[in-house]
Amino acid sequence: MYVMDEAFDGWYTPKTYHDYSRIFAENWQDDLTTMIAKDYSHPSVILYSIGNEVSETAFPQGVETADKLTRFVHALDDTRPVTAGINVLLNVYAQKGIGVYKESGPYKPEPLPP
């Protein structure tokens, strides 16, 4: 079995209220370091993913973020390639200011478990 070790499903742009974008800026380095340290010796892990369907890549800041994340991963493990799942349709929507993952209507917070 081959494994793509995926770190994030988003960076700065929220898909839902409780997703990783709320803490990305403060935690991405620690989380990548932990993930790579955990899986570095696993022979099934053949590549790393720095994002899945991240619409930020439609903008210069997103391209810079992808480059920064890739360089960081390669500094920790230069033996595996790094990829990101880019959904071009989401990028088009992002360019037009449409957030397909945004919740419709007023936000109603859900209680979080203790």
For each feature predicted by the language model, list its residue ranges.
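Substrate-binding/catalytic cleft of secreted carbohydrate-active enzymes
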Residues: 1-114
